[in-house]
């Protein structure tokens, strides 16, 4: 039995082949769906794998970006790998110094703060002419605040191993980004003028953020040193150490500069200098951290990046709210790039309407 026939135009039609071709459409659709499921699953697993290390990965990229000019100069003299190793070792030395300072200075303070909060729980509020229900509600709020404070202190104590792991990942990626700087630069090199302008906006914002970050953190350290001297927390060497710690902590995702003035204020209150402790807390909150991060920083970044300071503030607050400390950098960059993309889209629309 023949399985084909000849059409009038001379083309042979194979019945079996036609049946397979008819099945080919649905078969290809199923195959495409399965392929996309596999791709999405792999991407989701990759994101889940990288997500715990996203913060050190992100800050490693920022550090490598900031060290890039120095890396280029060193590369000309000692080579790319040697330059990357030297800079990574320098960062490792800084990380070890910070770890030692944390162990020998903050650990006793955290322990004392925990004991102080525990003692506060035993205090009973007794205010004349105030209903017991109000006092009971107030005690409940205070107890909740104390429990959260104790939980935060415990989390700081157990954060040292996490800090070490993040430092290892951070330094590894810094070295990788420095060694592979040529490949990374080629990866974000485009010929399309629109993409080039968008990348330049992101680059300009990132440069502004890094410059302002460095400048502001140095000023924070100076102000913290002055604060420790003004409120008589310590002598000059310890005050200078507090300033250096403020600068260093401002670069660490896990910590921040406010921890230094908080420790100083707690020390003053424990010594009985309550007014001085409150004064240092107000001074630190207003001039060191976190208020300057959301007032002075947006204005400086906006001026450097030629961007609206209100949008920078929105980017910083929204980024921090959604992404933590790294959102201070990601938020303004995303907004600036998004606005540049909107401008390019409007230009394309205008050209289309004219044509």
UniProtKB/Swiss-Prot annotation:
Subcellular location: Cell membrane
Pfam families per UniProt: AI-2E_transport
Top-level taxon: Archaea
A GO cellular component annotation in the UniProt record: plasma membrane
UniProt entry keywords in alphabetical sequence: Cell membrane, Membrane, Transmembrane, Transmembrane helix, Transport
Segments traversing the membrane: 34-54, 55-75, 84-104, 158-178, 212-232, 240-260, 274-294, 310-330
Main localisation: membrane
Membrane topology term: Multi-pass membrane protein
InterPro entries referenced in this protein's UniProt entry, alphabetically: AI-2E-like
Family as reported in the entry's similarity comment: Belongs to the autoinducer-2 exporter (AI-2E) (TC 2.A.86) family.
PANTHER family the record matches: TRANSMEMBRANE PROTEIN (PTHR21716), TRANSPORT PROTEIN MJ1177-RELATED (PTHR21716:SF71)
Protein name: Putative transport protein PH1000
Species of origin: Pyrococcus horikoshii (strain ATCC 700860 / DSM 12428 / JCM 9974 / NBRC 100139 / OT-3)
Lineage, opening ranks: Archaea, Methanobacteriati, Methanobacteriota, Thermococci, Thermococcales
């Amino acid at each position: 039995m023949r399985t084909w026939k000849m059409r009038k135009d001379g083309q042979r039609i194979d019945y079996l082949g036609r049946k397979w071709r008819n099945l080919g459409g649905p078969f290809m659709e199923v195959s495409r769906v399965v392929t996309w499921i596999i791709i999405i699953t792999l991407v989701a697993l990759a994101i889940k794998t990288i997500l715990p290390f996203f913060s050190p990965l992100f800050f490693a990229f920022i550090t490598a970006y900031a060290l890039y000019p120095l890396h280029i100069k060193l590369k000309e003299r000692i080579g790319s790998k040697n330059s990357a190793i030297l800079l990574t070792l320098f960062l490792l030395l800084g990380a070890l110094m910070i770890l030692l300072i944390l162990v020998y200075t903050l650990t006793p303070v955290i322990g004392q703060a925990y004991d102080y909060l525990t003692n506060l729980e035993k205090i009973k509020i007794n205010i004349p002419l105030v209903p017991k229900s109000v006092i009971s509600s107030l005690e409940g709020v205070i107890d909740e605040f104390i429990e959260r404070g104790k939980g935060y202190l415990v989390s700081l104590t157990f954060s040292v191993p996490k800090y070490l792991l993040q430092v290892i990942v951070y330094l590894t990626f810094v070295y990788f980004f420095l060694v592979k700087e040529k490949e990374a630069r080629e990866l974000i090199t485009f010929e399309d003028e629109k993409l080039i302008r968008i990348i330049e906006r992101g680059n300009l914002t990132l440069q502004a953020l890094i410059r302002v970050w460095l400048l502001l953190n140095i000023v924070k350290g100076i102000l913290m040193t002055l604060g420790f001297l003004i409120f008589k927390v310590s002598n000059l060497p310890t005050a200078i150490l507090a300033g250096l710690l403020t600068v260093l902590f401002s670069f660490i995702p896990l910590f921040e500069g406010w921890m230094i003035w908080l420790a100083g204020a707690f020390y003053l209150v424990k010594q009985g200098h309550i007014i001085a402790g409150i004064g240092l807390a107000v001074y630190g909150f207003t001039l060191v951290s976190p208020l300057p991060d959301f007032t002075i920083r947006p204005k400086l970044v906006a001026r450097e990046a030629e961007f609206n300071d209100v949008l920078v503030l929105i980017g910083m607050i929204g980024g921090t709210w959604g992404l933590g400390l790294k959102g201070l950098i990601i938020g303004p960059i995303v907004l600036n790039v998004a606005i540049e993309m909107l401008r390019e889209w409007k230009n394309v629309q205008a050209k289309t309407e004219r044509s």
